[in-house]
């Protein structure tokens, strides 16, 4: 956040971060959502970057027995020592597996309140109704599973049901699982998803796991899951867990449908997705993500059809600019934003305002920013006079 605020955005607004192991992205997503829902902010840029591919990190996870080592993979596939193997199949969520593969990732999203998104004509890729967080309570081992993730998944499912209805949850939803590729995860997470599906009357709950392709980027991993979900709605394909040929025997599956092959899906047939993240130490988080067509339906109900007509008109230019930028970036022809020592604000940029009684009531930073109100209301006002 420091680098982005100081050298990319020149941001003077609220900033902050949460660190929650592998659930870090969702913890920060929740922080941005709460700031917008409370009216504290109208826009929030949320994201994480993780670059753990260093000898020290590899050694630490290897000591834990969490990584898919070459020797383990050869043993898993009944190969002789030194034999070559397909390293692209190293991470096998919910299959016969032996650990995860570390990855680098940087994922950022822009959240806006309803009115601002419509006013700007922003590309609406989906929406997040909430992120639910629960710890595990007392634990036998800090790395062991607990009850917390059952609670977060159940809450996320309940939130989806309250918005899109019981039938849509049962027939038109999907789960982006944490799916690390470890034996412990395949047992614990499948049990959680299977139990919640049973309690909510869901049969054949579709389960995807993007780590099969990109590995485990730790703090950014839920960002990978979110991007995969948004891509599902943009391109109409559910990514299959194609590193797995068959599920492991200890995977719970009575109420689940693990998507092992790419599955073409009409973008309008999945209304909601649940993202699940299980962070080391009991940092459990699950998010409810609504499809673009559901988001637009909600916006039309709240703001009226005229507002939506105006939005689609504004969006034409935005969508064209977005496509042009994407094409340029894909060609390697992108413009780097880096404002080092550019537009630095000091005391001379501050202008304080006062009421007619001389009470300091506002401060403005620079000429192009609106004044900041200093006449703050507090529930404790006057109690200490």
Describe these PLM feature segments.
Residues 26, 52-90, 134-155, 180-192, ...:
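Active-site-adjacent elements of ketosynthase-type condensing enzymes
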Residues 25, 32, 61, 110, ...:
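Conserved small-residue
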Residues 15-20, 41-49, 123-132, 166-177, ...:
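Beta-strand segments within the central parallel beta-sheet cores of soluble alpha/beta enzyme folds
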Residues 1-15, 35, 49-60, 162-187, ...:
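Conserved beta-ketoacyl condensing-enzyme motif
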Residues 1-31, 64-67, 71-101, 192-224:
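Conserved catalytic cysteine-centered active-site region
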Residues 72-174, 291-358:
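Condensing-enzyme catalytic core mediating Claisen C-C bond formation in acyl metabolism
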Residues 1-14, 344-385:
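A glycine- and small-residue-enriched flexible loop/hinge segment at structural boundaries
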Residues 5, 15-50, 100-122, 216-241, ...:
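Active-site-proximal alpha-helical scaffold in enzymes
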